[in-house]
Amino acid sequence: MEHQVSAALREFTQRYVAQWQQQHGDWPSSHALYGIPSPCVVYSRDDCVFWRPEPGRGEDLEGIGRALDIRLHPALAPFFTTQYAGDMRARWNEIEMDLVQVWSVEDLHRLQENQIGHLVTQRRLKLSPTLFLASTADELSMVTLCNLSGSVLLEQFGSPQRRVLAQTLTEFLAELQPLAQEVG
């Protein structure tokens, strides 16, 4: 049975790609990802890569849990392993964000290292564990997944200040509005 997060992520991605194609007449594009190998690459032109989502290859995120001896919330793995894609700009109510996605196998390894670093910082500051999902325009805030409850939060980096955006990642993805703008 397909995980609900996988289905919700695929549905959001379809809406994102459709909006991009309607507004720009082409696949989503990125200057920041130009020249970086990925199964997503459709073609490159003028220092820009055009991409489409591609299915993940069965990777997991268990390295994060093993590194810190914690059990990851079950919603996290499908969010990052369902597909390869470029980061996607979106809006949730008034908050604009860049949804973090995995571009390649190498990018997945980098993501895991960054998540471990995030969790180590939280442990050092005695904060409950979260895992980042998206960056925001405000460099001090990010959208995260609470590893204990599975809620999606707007979190101030290094602070206990957190606001619940959605009770589940599936609910969050269903309410997220795609913005056909280049990320990065």
UniProtKB/Swiss-Prot annotation:
InterPro entries: Syd, Syd_sf
Signal peptide stretch: none
Keyword Membrane: yes
Main location: membrane
Superkingdom of origin: Bacteria
GO cellular component, one term: cytoplasmic side of plasma membrane
Membrane disposition: Peripheral membrane protein
Subcellular location: Cell inner membrane
Keywords: Cell inner membrane, Cell membrane, Membrane
Keyword Cell membrane found: yes
HAMAP family with a match to the protein in the record: Syd
Family named by the database record: Belongs to the Syd family.
Function, as annotated: Interacts with the SecY protein in vivo. May bind preferentially to an uncomplexed state of SecY, thus functioning either as a chelating agent for excess SecY in the cell or as a regulatory factor that negatively controls the translocase function.
Name by which UniProt lists this protein: Protein Syd
Name of the gene this protein is made from: syd
